[in-house]
Amino acid sequence: MHDKILILDFGSQVTQLIARRVREANVYSEIHPYDVDASFIRDFAPKGVILSGGPSSVTETDTPRVPQAVFELGVPVLGICYGMQAMAEQLGGKVDIGHLREFGYAEVRARNHTSLLEGISDFTTPEGHGMLKVWMSHGDKVLEMPPGFALMASTESCPIAAMADETRHFYGLQWHPEVTHTVQGRAMLERFVLKICGAQPDWEMGHYIDEAVAKIREQVGQEHVILGLSGGVDSSVAAALLHRAIGDQLTCVFVDHGLLRLNEAEQVMATFADHLGVKVIHVDASEVFLRKLAGVTDPEAKRKIIGAEFVEVFQTEAGKLTDAKWLAQGTIYPDVIESAGKGKKATQTIKSHHNVGGLPETLNLKLLEPLRELFKDEVRELGVKLGLPPAMVYRHPFPGPGLGVRILGEVKRDFADLLRRADAIFIETLRTFIDKETGKSWYDLTSQAFAVFLPVKSVGVMGDGRTYEYVVALRAVQTLDFMTAHWAHLPHELLGHVSNRIINEVRGINRVVYDISGKPPATIEWE
């Protein structure tokens, strides 16, 4: 049994980052709504509790409060931003609406050598004061600390920027240690989790495999399992883990909708059927999908058609496997958190969150989600340990509807063929061009890169003749969380090389453009 950290969510946009930082310290953590029952908190038996930030103000009535059980557990508690304010208010301090709001970088002075911050600093002033570069995002502030608390840090505009009760091991930070902008944020969270809470750093993917395999075997027994294999990271890792656990009791259904990347279907079959020995039913349904998409130009309509047809094809194939009792899905922890919703009780039913959602009821199958406790980076690490090729595990995100939403307007087979080849040239070039400063490929330096087919023709000149052919747009972005993104400043030499290859090798395309839009205002995908 792993030591656990309980994170109570008060509505912050970055609560997931808290859990990720804790797990990066090799300690298991879970996020639950702030209003969970006292019995749930006690049964969870955490080594410590972290209270997230949130958009509310404790100065108003009917705003979220920390369950009293948290303060009665006898374990360390860390309040972040709103979590600190709620702690201060409920334990006898005073919080007021701040007249000077703090949003962005701030430099705070650490005080009183508390166990949370002692020895942690970014620089020292000439007077010898330890200073921290942190990220603030708050309006309200603590005016008076509760009894038993001492000042831990301050800024000019926020005299009580952090506070500590060393006797009860209660701590409050007005800044956000979970974001990368707080330079020593990871060190602070590690100090709290490992030293103050005393949690054992034993959450590691190598150990997780053994635990997950044992759990799957106990859950499934001798029954058979079906998994919809898309070729994406989540379903691929789920397939590898399930096969490790139950072998031939697993059957994967791989639906090829004709909108995959170049040679992707062959690569999936080679990896799973040939290399790993997984039973895979390969269904080439491209004719059906393309027929249903004929004449459809609206992006949302295309998504719905592809999603509905996938369910139809999968259901038909799954129905043939009469001995199957379980449907496996590649649900991961962010899906679970998002499905639970903000401010919902932890005991509420969490809906399935995948492109085959709803199928368990339709097929009368039990639901199996072997990755539901893991973040994406943990899923990738697990995939490599299970023997999947790193090139597959660390591939850029690819939308469920595939090229269907990277072909603007109507989807046609010849458009898909042109785009597949252009996209493959772009990705291959990104993999082979190395950045001299970092020594990394430009594929690894970008978070997502792809080509988009534009259904417009432009005039060109090839040899002695004029051409009238299609246009392809290239898109490459860099991002930490995909909520915002910057367009990647790819070398001109790389872009020129890609353009020349596409125009020379892909007959039907005579113009290549590069998208230099950020998110916002643009989205990463074009549709």
UniProtKB/Swiss-Prot annotation:
EC class name: ligase
EC number: 6.3.5.2
GO cellular component, one term: cytosol
Alphabetic keyword roster: ATP-binding, Glutamine amidotransferase, GMP biosynthesis, Ligase, Nucleotide-binding, Purine biosynthesis
Example GO molecular function: ATP binding
Function: Catalyzes the synthesis of GMP from XMP.
Entry-linked NCBIfam families: guaA_Cterm, guaA_Nterm, PRK00074.1
Name the UniProt record assigns to this protein: GMP synthase [glutamine-hydrolyzing]
UniProt organism field: Paraburkholderia xenovorans (strain LB400)
Origin organism lineage: Bacteria, Pseudomonadati, Pseudomonadota, Betaproteobacteria, Burkholderiales
Gene: guaA
